[in-house]
């Protein structure tokens, strides 16, 4: 009996030691700064933008943020988290925001060199609960949407900060939007000091994921699953659904006064030249997933795919695309354009620089 007792005591001590060791080893990525790595420029990057001041900023895995003033020499930024980052927006040369997993919203005040946390999943859960609780109390039996949303927010808090933001777009240094999984829509009008939940204003009763937000004339457009396209109505403050001809997932939207281009799964893309009143299917020449797109200065559009392809439209109407020769098949997830038809794409192998002016000259 004494031997069994001693063995049990030893087992308990060993388990406690293991638990203590595990607690010591685990570091919450929301509280752990991104590690500096010489390989950050060739590791997984998901989003990229070019600031109004001409700087390139890319974001990606484990909190990696890179910046460059010439698209050749890249520098790693100081980032207070090590969660995956997926999107970045700079409305001015110095002020920018990045979003990603764990409900993270980061802000930079120095052109992307360093970042601070404005929101994370722990505070996001409390924000959602505070928003939905009074609406749930007023909800009728026939319209239980707010009650279900409150239950979902409470479950989110219990399970931990795993809900991601998937995109961010700022109009100016004060006003911006962040969107994400399960109809997550936030807006700020004070540079991110406070965030307002707008999810109840969206025509998205199934709480579909929102993959991208784009701005046109200070108006927000959101795209997501099951062909969802939402247009902000400045008069009512609601995000109203626009009918689209495709029932699959949209991963991106290009919004210009002369063109709206939706793109997503299986090489599917549709163009509208009348603000979404009518749509024409686009010949992309691929069955691969279209992950991101951007406009060149001459109006042509460039798209990148999960197959690692770079597609360029023949003209500004974006009715037909052709493949630009690339020397890799690594997936591409983000694209931004600069002067003289230069483009920076990011993906599984990090940063790629393309000279699309040279491609046009060789045709």
Spans of model-derived segments:
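N-terminal signal peptide c-region/cleavage motif recognized by signal peptidases
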Residues: 14-21
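Residue-level hotspots at or immediately adjacent to binding/recognition sites across diverse folds
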Residues: 21-363
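Bacterial N-terminal signal peptides that target proteins for export
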Residues: 1-8
């Amino acid at each position: 009996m004494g031997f069994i007792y001693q063995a049990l005591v030893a087992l308990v001590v060993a388990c406690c030691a293991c638990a203590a060791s595990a607690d010591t080893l685990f570091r919450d990525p929301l509280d752990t700064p991104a590690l500096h790595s010489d390989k950050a420029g060739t590791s997984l990057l998901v989003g990229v933008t070019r600031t109004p001041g001409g700087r390139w900023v890319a974001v990606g895995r484990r909190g990696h943020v890179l910046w460059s003033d010439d698209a050749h020499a890249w520098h790693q930024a100081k980032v207070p988290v090590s969660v995956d980052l997926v999107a970045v927006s700079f409305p001015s040369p110095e002020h920018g925001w990045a979003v990603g997993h764990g409900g993270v919203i980061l802000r930079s005040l120095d052109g992307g060199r360093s970042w601070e946390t404005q929101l994370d999943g722990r505070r996001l859960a409390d924000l959602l609960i505070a928003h939905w609780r009074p609406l749930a109390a007023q909800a009728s039996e026939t319209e239980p949407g707010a009650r279900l949303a409150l239950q979902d927010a409470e479950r989110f808090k219990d399970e931990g900060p795993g809900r991601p933001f998937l995109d961010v777009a700022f109009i100016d240094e004060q006003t911006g939007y962040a969107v994400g999984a399960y109809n997550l829509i936030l807006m700020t009008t004070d540079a991110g000091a406070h965030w307002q939940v707008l999810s109840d204003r969206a025509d998205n009763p199934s709480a579909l994921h929102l993959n991208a937000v784009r701005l046109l004339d200070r108006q927000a457009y959101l795209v997501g699953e099951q062909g969802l396209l939402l247009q902000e109505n400045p008069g009512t403050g609601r995000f109203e659904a626009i009918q689209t001809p495709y029932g699959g997932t949209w991963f991106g939207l290009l919004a210009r006064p002369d063109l709206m281009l939706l793109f997503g799964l299986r090489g599917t893309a549709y163009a509208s030249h009348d603000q979404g009143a009518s749509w024409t299917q686009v010949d992309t020449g691929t069955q691969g997933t279209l992950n991101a797109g951007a406009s060149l200065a001459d109006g042509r559009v460039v798209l990148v795919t999960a197959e690692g392809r770079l597609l360029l439209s023949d003209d500004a109407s974006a009715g037909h695309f052709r493949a630009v020769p690339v020397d890799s098949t690594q997936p591409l997830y983000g694209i931004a354009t600069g002067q003289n038809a230069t483009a920076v794409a990011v993906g599984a192998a990090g940063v790629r620089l393309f000279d699309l002016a040279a491609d046009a000259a060789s045709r």
